[in-house]
Amino acid sequence: YDGLDGIEDGIVSNIYAARANRDNFLKQITEKYGLTKAQLKTIDVYENGYTLDYAMANGMNAYHGYSALEGGAMDLGPDPVPREPLDTTYNVHHGDRADGVFKYFITKDPNWVLIDHDYYHPDQELYDMLMAASEEYDANSPEFDDFIANNGKLIYFAGWNDMSMSPWQLIQQYRGYVEKYGQEKVDSFCKFYVMPGVTHTKGIAMNYLSWLDVWCSTGEYPTETLYATMSATGGQMPMAEFPGWVKYEGGDPMDGASYSISTEIPDGFWGVYD
């Protein structure tokens, strides 16, 4: 996948082409490592997410997967036996956080054993607790009327390799803003960037506070090309505003001017691979 963006530099920038070829990659690693059905099922959840037969209080019933087959690093832990309480040192990454959320936020029961329950088919007690928690802690509302009325400005950001907060889920949320307000209105208060080689808060250095300050102070977003420094190479890349991706055009790969923002996306991508 690395060369699909024009340069092999350890950063998968053309995430769309990579994702469209993921089945071939999955076949290769399955044959190479002899992946079991259980392992493939786990990869499928990481890559494609999951859908519930019921909806949360806000109407959501699905969570999009990550870029697990396009450069994302999955940490499933060295211990195949879940501990109680779950321990990220030995069990799946973020397992202890999910365990704590259920123990202390959702069920209010410190003796709750996370893996002892079926969340796809919850009993009435668990269902009621999920509904109550989803209403109390919901942070997915596309409602920005007050924010817009007060001239609020938002730089919305996702990393393609973030395995803690799915970039595809954030894209879905951004689309909710566009569906509600229209693209022109959203552009007036929100700039959405998705960058390659970026995990959860790591992989990039960018001066977004200065950009936001200019926008809020002058009412105009910076018009010049904005660059970020990539941790993987130490070089610069231009900020890719969604749905664009960073394409190498030639020249010094450390120089941000050697790249462009491409909107070339495989035909039929949306609705199939997102």
Model-derived segments and their meaning:
Residues Y1-D274:
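C-terminal His-loop and adjacent cap/lid subdomain of alpha/beta-hydrolase
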